[in-house]
Amino acid sequence: MTHSHNLLGEPPATLLPGIPAADAALAAGTDPAEVAAAHPTASAAWAALAEGALDGGRTIEAYAYARTGYHRGLDALRRNGWKGYGPVPWSHEPNRGFLRCVTVLAQAAERIGETDEHDRCTQLLRDCDPSLAA
């Protein structure tokens, strides 16, 4: 017998805790490089660095920043119960740093011809939050 749906259902959404000091520093306009140095686990700081580099045409730099934030985010997700699948909603502010890193990683990968990585990142975004599929 074949079933076309998951009988166990979808796992609960993973909601990362914020990093208040890093979040406050970024909100106050502190240079994201300073924030990343002081709070290296803060994906939001890495996302800001990656976005700035990508906007400035520095694709390899953007790729490196985004990959760092992506890995820091994966570590945080796992520490908070994520098993490699399930919702990571954009609507929860502390999740956005990780999701922004995945977005920039996909864009930078596409620019350097890493089609497989672009596709994996795009699928991860869809899996984390279907509203990010566009």
Question: Where do the model's predicted regions map?
Answer:
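Start-of-helix signal in alpha-solenoid helical-repeat scaffolds, especially tetratricopeptide repeats
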Residues: 43, 92-95, 99
